[in-house]
Amino acid sequence: MAATFFGEVVRTPCRAGTEEEEEEEDGNRETPEDREVRRQLARKREVRLFRRQTKTTLEVSLLEKHPCSKFIIAIGNNAVAFLSSFVMNSGAWEEVGCAKLWNEWCRTTDTAHLSPTEAFCVFYHLKSNPSVMLCQCSCYVAEDQQYQWLEKVFGSCPRKNMQVTILTCRHVTDYKTSESTSSLHTPFLKALKTQNFKEPPFCSLLEQPNIVHDLPAAVLSYCQVWRIPAVLYLCYTDVMKLDLITIEAFKPVLSSKSLKCLVKNIPQSTEILKKLMTTNEIQSNIYT
C-alpha cells in the first residue's frame, strides 16, 4: 500500500501476489484424470448388499425383501461374539444378505466361513420365524457410507411396526463423568432409546453430555426420525479386543422382550463362548 499527499491510501499492484493466486488456481483445477480417479474411488466406496450363496446383488432394500418385526444389530467384535454365542446358537438362522464395504479401515471378506477376527457385515433371519432378523457387523462403516448402509438395509420408507435393538461397545475413556474413569467398574452398560421405545431398558440411561458415535448413532437417529421403536445398549469397557468379560456384560439384555424368546440354554451358550474365545486366541497367536 502507498499513501498520497492528501492522506488517501491506495493499493499498489503486486505481481508476486497475482502469480501466487494463479499458481493456486492451477493447482485447484481438476484434470480429467483426477475426475476419473474420484469416480473410481466413489464407486469402490459404494455399499452393496448381495447374497453370498448366489453371488447376486439385492436390487431392493433388505427389509423390503424381508419384512421384520424384530431387528437385532450387533456392531463390533464383542457384540458380534455375544450374539453368536447366546442368540444364534439357540436357533436355526439363515443368511439372507451380506454387505460389501471398502474404506480406509475396512475390507470386508467374501468367504463363506467367517472367523471373529475378520471384517464382515452379515444379515440373518430365524428359520422358524422369518420376521426376526439379526445383523452381525464387525467392520467399520465410514461416515460417508452410513447413509448408504441405512438406505440399503432399511429402505427409503421403512416399516414402523418393528422394534430395533442395537448392541455395541466404546472405550471407557469416551465416557464423560465427574468421577475419575479409573474409579469406574468396567465393563458397564448404558442405554439410549428413541421416543417411541416404551419398554424400560435393562440398565441406566446414558447421561448428558455423553454421545454415541458412528453406525450405532446413525441407526438410532434414523429410527428416531422414522418413529421406529429402538434401543441402543452401549457397553463401556477398557478392553476393545475380543474379551470374555466385556461380552458377558451384555447378559442383562437377554431378559429383554426382543431377545428373551430367542435364548434357550444360557449355560451351554457360555461354554460355546469360551470355546470361541479359545479359538480366537489360537488364531491370534503368531507362534502357532
UniProtKB/Swiss-Prot annotation:
GO terms for biological process: chaperone-mediated protein complex assembly; proteasome core complex assembly. The keyword Aminoacyl-tRNA synthetase does not apply. The modification Phosphoserine is found at S180. The keyword Acetylation applies. The modification Phosphothreonine is found at T18, T54. It comes from Bos taurus. The modification N-acetylalanine is found at A2. This is Proteasome assembly chaperone 1. Chaperone protein which promotes assembly of the 20S proteasome as part of a heterodimer with PSMG2. The PSMG1-PSMG2 heterodimer binds to the PSMA5 and PSMA7 proteasome subunits, promotes assembly of the proteasome alpha subunits into the heteroheptameric alpha ring and prevents alpha ring dimerization. InterPro entries: Proteasome_assmbl_chp_1. Its main location: cytoplasm. Forms a heterodimer with PSMG2. The PSMG1-PSMG2 heterodimer interacts directly with the PSMA5 and PSMA7 proteasome alpha subunits.
